Curated annotation (Swiss-Prot):
<comment type="subunit">
    <text>Heterotetramer of two alpha and two beta chains.</text>
</comment>
<dbReference type="GO" id="GO:0004358">
    <property type="term" value="F:glutamate N-acetyltransferase activity"/>
</dbReference>
<feature type="binding site">
    <location>
        <position position="402"/>
    </location>
    <ligand>
        <name>substrate</name>
    </ligand>
</feature>
<dbReference type="InterPro" id="IPR016117">
    <property type="entry name" value="ArgJ-like_dom_sf"/>
</dbReference>
<keyword id="KW-0012">Acyltransferase</keyword>
<keyword id="KW-0511">Multifunctional enzyme</keyword>
<feature type="site" description="Involved in the stabilization of negative charge on the oxyanion by the formation of the oxyanion hole">
    <location>
        <position position="117"/>
    </location>
</feature>
<keyword id="KW-0068">Autocatalytic cleavage</keyword>
<keyword id="KW-0808">Transferase</keyword>
<feature type="binding site">
    <location>
        <position position="191"/>
    </location>
    <ligand>
        <name>substrate</name>
    </ligand>
</feature>
<dbReference type="GO" id="GO:0006526">
    <property type="term" value="P:L-arginine biosynthetic process"/>
</dbReference>
<feature type="site" description="Cleavage; by autolysis">
    <location>
        <begin position="190"/>
        <end position="191"/>
    </location>
</feature>
<feature type="binding site">
    <location>
        <position position="180"/>
    </location>
    <ligand>
        <name>substrate</name>
    </ligand>
</feature>
<dbReference type="GO" id="GO:0004042">
    <property type="term" value="F:L-glutamate N-acetyltransferase activity"/>
</dbReference>
<keyword id="KW-0055">Arginine biosynthesis</keyword>
<dbReference type="InterPro" id="IPR042195">
    <property type="entry name" value="ArgJ_beta_C"/>
</dbReference>
<dbReference type="Pfam" id="PF01960">
    <property type="entry name" value="ArgJ"/>
</dbReference>
Length: 407
């Protein structure tokens, strides 16, 4: 059961220059869409980031090769099978899918980027995907975002979709995005896919820089189970349909408002993944302040967010704050003065100067821990740096979902 506000927005803005479709190809699931195609306008700029897992999936390898050679026109995603751990045959099948779509659409093979998500180590039924391409291409439409968001789901219990309109000095821009992911989530880029499009006119090189920076604030600041997937990919597309005035540097007056709006969309999509974490009952924000560097704040936040002992304590609504201190201690911060560290659960100080806070009571701790959304605030008191990671608790259902995944 997803935690908190996970509703699809009432208004989903179509992005001029983007068309989508979702089709049932029968890759793994019966009676549901599992093949999603996105068509990108010719003049659009596209940026991509991919998993840092060395055992990356075949479609990721093909995607990287194609993206280095041409500007994308089509994105093709299948669910139910990751096409990872499939060797040379898996790569050939990813290439075959791209070639088939390219031939049907009349574009170069390199302009098609493949994406897969699902079970690792099983041969991909590329024939079923290729057979579904005609229907996918025939049903492309600008208002199919919700269908596409449902089509990319695996163990996700909800479609993950957000959309917003941005007004900047009289110019109107739209941003719409979708993501998928529920388990195997600890991006360095998890089984996580994200697709965001805007009608802003942004230079390709700058768009790539923006995506890399925004990704660090969003998809690279979430964890469900600490596992980095073989298939993570995130795409940002700028079609340019809203304006002929190109944003080509951070000094452009529209750059910062657009950057902030895009970051808001990405953070929302990343948080939706955590809120829908496999078996999750609580959404946790781990905020670390007072660090010497952002990196040490990040290290501490991830140590706490990854800890099975911390996560199970939150599932049990048990204010066992010693587990948080232990995680802070093994995060690898050099010369940490533990007698300066303070820890809060929401508004309740549980640890002051490295020991139990004089004002803390078990009753106050239990009250906070019963909430579905909780912020763990750790103040290292050694600098001005800050960082935040989003995670969820670890429940019995997480084990059941993953134990039963292939059955």
């Amino acid at each position: 059961m997803a935690v908190g506000n996970v509703a699809v927005p009432e208004t989903i803005y179509p992005i001029e220059g983007i068309k989508l479709s979702a089709t049932a190809a029968g890759v793994r699931y019966k009676d549901r869409d599992d093949l999603v195609v996105i068509e990108i306008a010719t003049d659009a700029a596209t940026a991509v980031v991919t998993t840092k897992n060395a055992f990356c999936a075949a479609p990721v390898r093909v995607l990287r090769e194609h993206f280095a050679k041409a500007s994308p026109r089509y994105l093709v995603t299948n669910t139910g099978n990751a096409n990872a751990g499939t060797g040379a045959d898996g790569k050939r099948r990813a290439i075959d899918i791209c070639a088939a779509l390219a031939a049907k659409a009349g574009v170069n093979n390199n302009t098609v980027l493949p994406f897969s998500t699902g079970v690792i180590g099983e041969p991909l039924n590329s024939e079923a995907i290729i057979a579904g391409l005609d229907n996918a291409l025939a049903n492309l439409a600008p208002d199919n975002w919700l269908a596409a968001a449902n089509g990319i789901r695996t163990t996700d219990t909800i479609p993950k979709l957000t959309s917003k309109k941005v007004n900047v000095a009289g110019s109107h821009y739209h941003i719409t995005g979708m993501s998928k992911g529920s388990g195997m989530i600890r991006p360095n880029m998890a089984t996580m896919l994200g697709y965001v499009a805007t009608d802003a006119n942004i230079a390709a090189d700058l768009l790539q820089e923006m995506l890399s920076a925004i990704n660090e604030q969003s998809f690279n600041r979430i964890t469900v189970d600490g596992d980095t997937s073989t298939n993570d990919c995130c795409v940002l597309i700028a079609t340019g349909a809203a304006s002929s005035d190109i944003i080509d540097s951070p000094e452009h007056p529209h750059y910062q408002p657009l950057f902030d709006a895009l970051a808001e969309v990405f953070i929302r999509l990343a948080q939706l993944i955590v809120r829908d974490g496999e078996g999750a009952t609580k959404f946790m924000t781990v905020k670390v302040t007072g660090g010497k560097t952002t990196q040490e704040c990040c290290d501490v936040a991830y140590a706490v967010a990854h800890s099975p002992l911390v996560k199970t304590a939150f599932f049990a609504s048990d204010a066992n704050w010693g587990r948080i201190l232990a995680a802070v201690g093994y995060a690898g911060v050099e010369d940490l003065d533990t007698e300066q560290v303070d820890v809060y659960l929401d508004e309740v100080m549980i640890c002051q100067n490295g020991g139990v806070a004089p004002t803390y009571t078990e009753e106050a701790g239990k009250t906070v821990m019963s909430r579905p959304e909780i912020t763990i605030h750790i103040d290292l008191a050694r600098g001005e740096a800050i960082d935040t990671v989003y995670t969820c608790d670890l429940s019995y259902d997480y084990v059941k979902i993953n134990a039963d995944y292939r059955s």
